[in-house]
């Protein structure tokens, strides 16, 4: 059994691990399992930012398989992450809430904001469509 220590902000930790793994061109990244992290991974998969995710048998870890696209450059190909940026919006010390009308749009809708609503986690598009607001957890593009 691995000890992950005390993590005050599991979402911030998850985003940092994904960001660092993308910069290092890793194929996958392991994250401490929480239901919230699993729900975020599910949205990232649905929106095409990651290939897939998997929960370990002992439910201690969440493994995310990262997604890259090939970018042709002079003499060869370069792996480019499907995730350009991950940014934490609401933080443990400063929570950010919004009603459905005021949820910010990321890059004219090409990026997403993950919103924690009374009906669960969803993208900003889905929250606007359903007419519900909530806590703005993070943006991804």
Swiss-Prot record:
GO terms for cellular component: chloroplast; ribonucleoprotein complex; ribosome. It is found in: Plastid, Chloroplast. Gene3D superfamilies: 3.30.1370.30, 3.30.1490.10. Keywords: Chloroplast, Plastid, Ribonucleoprotein, Ribosomal protein, RNA-binding, rRNA-binding. InterPro entries: Ribosomal_uS8, Ribosomal_uS8_CS, Ribosomal_uS8_sf. One of its GO terms (biological process) is translation. It holds the Pfam family Ribosomal_S8. The keyword Oxidoreductase does not apply. Its main location: plastid. The keyword Lyase does not apply. SUPFAM superfamilies: Ribosomal protein S8. It comes from the Eukaryota. GO terms for molecular function: rRNA binding; structural constituent of ribosome. One of the primary rRNA binding proteins, it binds directly to 16S rRNA central domain where it helps coordinate assembly of the platform of the 30S subunit. Belongs to the universal ribosomal protein uS8 family. Part of the 30S ribosomal subunit. This is Small ribosomal subunit protein uS8c. It comes from Chlamydomonas reinhardtii (Chlamydomonas smithii). The lineage of its organism: Eukaryota, Viridiplantae, Chlorophyta, core chlorophytes, Chlorophyceae. The gene is rps8.
